[in-house]
Curated annotation (Swiss-Prot):
HAMAP family: MutS2. This is Endonuclease MutS2. It comes from the Bacteria. The lineage of its organism: Bacteria, Bacillati, Bacillota, Clostridia, Eubacteriales. The keyword RNA-binding applies. One of its GO terms (molecular function) is ATP-dependent DNA damage sensor activity. Residues 713-788 form the Smr domain. It comes from Clostridium botulinum (strain Langeland / NCTC 10281 / Type F). ATP binds at residues 332-339. Pfam families: MSSS, MutS_V, Smr.
Length: 788
């Protein structure tokens, strides 16, 4: 890729913007070296990593880059075997922590979306939590080692603290004793030793060692002899503390050295991730998308925006190239946006090929080119000097030497700077030669000859930048398929040039040129009208989709209401059954108590009375439930305009169509139109219909088994097989009948039948627990079973 083209297209400015989103100098250095990759595969992988990082920013928020540093110098020193400073060790630990946390950050549950490229990068992370923990435990700040760094350091500092307390007590006592000889009644420290500020004239009154004097010489700082030993002990402890700190730093540095490969790898991955997430943050800020990449020369940029132009002012452009045509000629007025179009296309390609998402709409297509050549400068006129023409021609010569079918060439005002006739002929020759090579070309021009060349040559297409003659301002919109019209006469007239001069100028133009310009004007008007119609259609489609989504959400809400109603109904029915079973169980327990007391006949009569009450109660609830759910009469036919009840959602609706052969009708519920079957329609209250029946049909019934089930079963006289069958059938009936506890009579005998029944009950689905009968219940001759 040509460095000159990269510079002309201002890719370096994108790099500078990108650097603002990084956390480390190392990531900035990666961006500094960023350029288009060498293959389509690399481009796709680096775009995918940016896309994945973009998704992670949205779904999981900012990545764990807190406290990430550039630790290259620390790694270098550790690798050489040097002892690192506390701050250097802390920064290395912070990077190791970031690498470990990032592995956790990117982790996802099985059902969540995976991040293939980023996960592959993170696979290389060593994770060194032990070293990380040791450093953070030992070092508290840039120049502060924690007491817990070692037991030796802890003991030294404790002794040092005690000695300092002792010497302060001693020197405070001396301050009071020598107060008349001191400049101030305080003590101070000189060279890590406690001293007194003694007046120079009284130096003999305070025996000791002179360590310093004031700038005026009026004060001597004397260490009293009684403190010398204590100060010596403090000094020794301080030296021991320093030696222990150096030992701790050496040990920690050695551990970094021993794991230098893991540390370097983790650091490099963190810096790479810093760079990748800078790309994602840039994409988020500039509303970028991930394009589709091909190597077939096909370009389809949808509403691309130049990222260096103010986002409030930039006008999106859409450019196609490579399928229907391989060369695009852009014509139009000066300052109309032709050069910006070239730069936008070129810069977007450089960004995509460097793994950056692009400022364009979704589904944009970018081709991978081996080279992007750009001959772009200030817009030129025919009065340009030979030197300027020569400068352009020098670039063109180089392009002609290297461009091939895998190249994109951008020409700004091709052929300008010389005689128009010669310039146009030269431009056509250059374009035709490159076209035959298969080179993809976008060129801007003023020459009518190039418009005509594009009209007649297959594979070459005209385009123009739109100009508003009313306001005398360009709109910067690109119109593909329409050559640019010269607006010199219209602009001159609006600026006040007399009509007779303009008319005379028109007379000097051939009829053929006039007709050509009129044709272009007509095409432009039709194209603009077509684009306006397309935009209107797109807006209508968006509004329709929005309304559709709103109705679908309302329908979903209604369905949820219906589902919740059904759930509530089922829950209520379940509660009714539960209450019924609890009431029946209570009655049975009371009856069993009565039976044990010898009141069997009365108990049975009471049981039947209670069961009848319970059945009547449930029938009443069931009838009430049925009447509540489906009001209205069943319908056989409906007509347009009828108001009916849609039973499934229990809501009144208006019939909009007659039933089809399947019985489906279109109805309106509020603002929604729904297709329903006539079987789901009922006569709404207050509506007159001829129905087949005026009776309320029960569509839902509480299916409770209220037939009488005995509270015990007698197995005496049966063999094992018959007994098992009888008990199984009986337990089903008892369970459906809502009994909570039953008795199985098997007799005492040899105990074989009892054992058979006990074994069967252990795995039975209806049995909660079972036991042998107690005294008064039949003893070991019966088994009492509690049902679920």
């Amino acid at each position: 890729m040509k460095d000159k083209s990269i510079k002309v297209l201002e890719f370096n400015k994108i790099q500078e913007i990108l650097k603002n989103y990084t956390c480390t100098k190392a990531a900035k250095d990666i961006i500094e070296d960023l350029k288009p990759y060498d293959s389509v595969y690399e481009v796709r992988e680096h775009l995918e990593e940016a896309k994945e990082a973009f998704k992670l920013l949205i779904t999981k928020g900012a990545p764990p880059f807190e406290g990430v540093y550039d630790i290259r110098n620390g790694i270098y020193l550790a690798e050489k075997g040097s002892a690192l400073l506390p701050g250097q060790l802390l920064k290395i630990a912070a990077v190791l922590r970031c690498a470990r946390r990032f592995k956790e950050y990117i982790n996802h549950k099985e059902e969540e979306e995976s991040y293939r490229v980023l996960e592959n990068i993170c696979e290389g992370i060593f994770s060194l939590p032990k070293i990380e923990e040791e450093i953070f435990n030992a070092i508290e700040g840039e120049d502060e080692i924690a007491d817990r760094a070692s037991s030796t350091l802890y003991n030294i500092r404790r002794s040092l603290k005690e000695k300092n307390y002792s010497v302060r007590d001693k020197i405070n006592s001396l301050v009071r004793s020598y107060s008349s000889y001191l400049q101030e009644n305080i003590y101070t420290v000189r060279g890590d030793r406690y001293v007194l500020p003694v007046k120079a004239e009284h130096k003999g009154a305070v025996p000791g060692l002179v360590h310093d004097q004031s700038s005026t010489g009026a004060t001597l700082f004397i260490e009293p002899m009684s403190l010398v030993n204590l100060n010596n002990e403090i000094k020794e402890l301080m030296l021991k503390e320093k030696a222990e700190i150096e030992r701790i730093l050496t040990v920690l540095s050695a551990k970094i050295n021993a794991n230098i490969t893991g540390v370097k790898t983790d650091a490099n991955i963190v810096w790479e991730l810093d760079f990748i997430f800078a790309k994602a943050k840039f994409a988020s800020e500039y509303n970028c998308t991930c394009p589709t990449i091909n190597n077939e020369g096909i370009v389809d940029i949808i509403e691309g925006r130049h990222p260096l132009i103010d986002r409030r002012e930039v006008v999106p452009i859409s450019v196609k190239l490579g399928e229907e045509f391989t060369s695009l000629m852009i014509t139009g007025p000066n300052t109309g946006g032709k050069t910006v179009t070239l730069k936008t296309v070129g810069l977007i390609h450089l960004m995509a090929m460097s793994g950056l998402m692009i400022p364009a709409r979704e589904n944009s297509v970018i081709s991978y080119f081996n080279n992007v050549f750009a001959d772009i400068g200030d817009e030129q006129s025919i009065e340009q000097s030979l030197s300027t023409f020569s400068s352009h021609m020098k670039n063109i010569v180089e392009i002609m030497d290297k461009a091939d079918e895998n190249s994109l060439v951008l020409f700004d005002e091709l052929g300008a700077g010389t005689d128009p006739t010669e310039g146009a002929a030269l431009a056509i020759s250059i374009l035709e030669n490159l076209r035959k090579r298969g080179t993809k070309i976008i060129a801007t021009t003023h020459y009518s000859e190039l418009k005509a060349y594009a009209l007649r040559k297959e594979g070459v297409e005209n385009a123009s930048v739109e100009f508003d003659v009313e306001t005398l301002r360009p709109t910067y919109r690109l119109l593909i398929g329409i050559p640019g019209k010269s607006n010199a006469f219209e602009i001159s007239k609006r600026l006040g040039l007399p009509d007779y001069i303009i008319d005379f100028a028109r007379e000097n133009i051939s009829n053929e040129n006039i007709r050509f310009e009129e044709l272009i004007e007509n095409l432009q008007e039709k194209s603009i009208k077509a684009q306006e119609d397309a935009r209107l259609a797109e807006n209508l489609k968006l509004e329709r989709d929005k309304e559709k989504k709103k109705y679908e959400e309302k329908l979903e809400g209604l369905q949820k209401v219906r589902d919740n109603a059904l759930i509530d109904a089922r829950r209520e029915a379940k509660n009714i059954i539960k209450e019924a079973k609890e009431e029946a169980d209570k009655i049975l327990k009371d009856i069993r108590q009565l039976e044990r007391m010898g009141y069997s006949s009365d108990a049975r009569r009471k049981l039947e009375e209670e069961r009848k009450k319970l059945k009547d109660k449930l029938d009443s609830i069931e009838e009430k439930e049925i009447k509540t759910v489906h009001k209205g009469e069943a319908l056989k036919n409906v007509k347009e305009g009828d108001e009916v009840l849609l039973a499934s959602i229990n809501q009144k609706v208006i019939v909009l169509s007659k039933p089809d052969n399947k019985g489906d009708v279109l109805v309106q519920a509020g603002i929604m139109k729904i297709t329903a079957n006539i079987k789901d329609l009922r006569a709404a209250k207050g509506s007159n219909f001829n129905s087949s029946s005026s009776k309320i049909k029960k569509s839902k019934k509480l299916n409770l088994n209220l037939r009488r089930v005995e509270s015990s079963v007698d197995l005496r006289g049966m063999d094992a097989e018959e007994a098992i069958y009888t008990v199984d059938k009986y337990l089903d009936e008892a369970y459906l009948g809502g009994l909570g506890e039953v008795t199985i009579v098997h007799g005492k005998g040899t105990g074989v039948l009892r054992k058979t029944i006990m074994d069967m009950l252990k795995g039975h689905s209806h049995v909660k627990r079972h036991r042998l009968g107690e005294y008064g219940e039949g003893g070991t001759g019966v088994t009492v079973v509690e049902l679920k």
